Swiss-Prot record:
Organism taxonomic ancestry: Bacteria, Pseudomonadati, Pseudomonadota, Gammaproteobacteria, Vibrionales
GO biological process: iron-sulfur cluster assembly
Cysteines engaged in disulfide bonds, as pairs: none
Domain of life, source organism: Bacteria
Annotated GO MF terms: ferric iron binding; ferrous iron binding
Designated gene of the protein: cyaY
The organism of origin for this protein: Vibrio parahaemolyticus serotype O3:K6 (strain RIMD 2210633)
InterPro entries registered for this protein in UniProt: CyaY, Frataxin/CyaY, Frataxin/CyaY_sf, Frataxin_CS
Name assigned to this protein: Iron-sulfur cluster assembly protein CyaY
Amino acid sequence: MNDTEFHQLVDAQMQIIEESIDDSGADIDYEVSGNVMTLEFEDRSQIIINRQEPMHEIWLASKSGGFHFKLVEDKWTCSKTGMELFEMVKQECEKHAGEEIDWA
């Protein structure tokens, strides 16, 4: 994939994350600045999601540590855990929020 395709795919993934947070009704603030999305929780803890263009990866940093995601068979997959990005975002949001979130 070239850089343009990478950015289009990451933009689509970030949009899914934003819409899911909005639809969940959870008390999560998010801000996108350049290549970085910051999710902030009531206790002021944060999850940082950013795109790494040179490696065509998405990186996620949270209380649980740092994770790198590569596009594998049309899914952003963690090189450490094998978990899909959106599943990791949901799991980490619930850890940071300290409660289950309705992602319906």
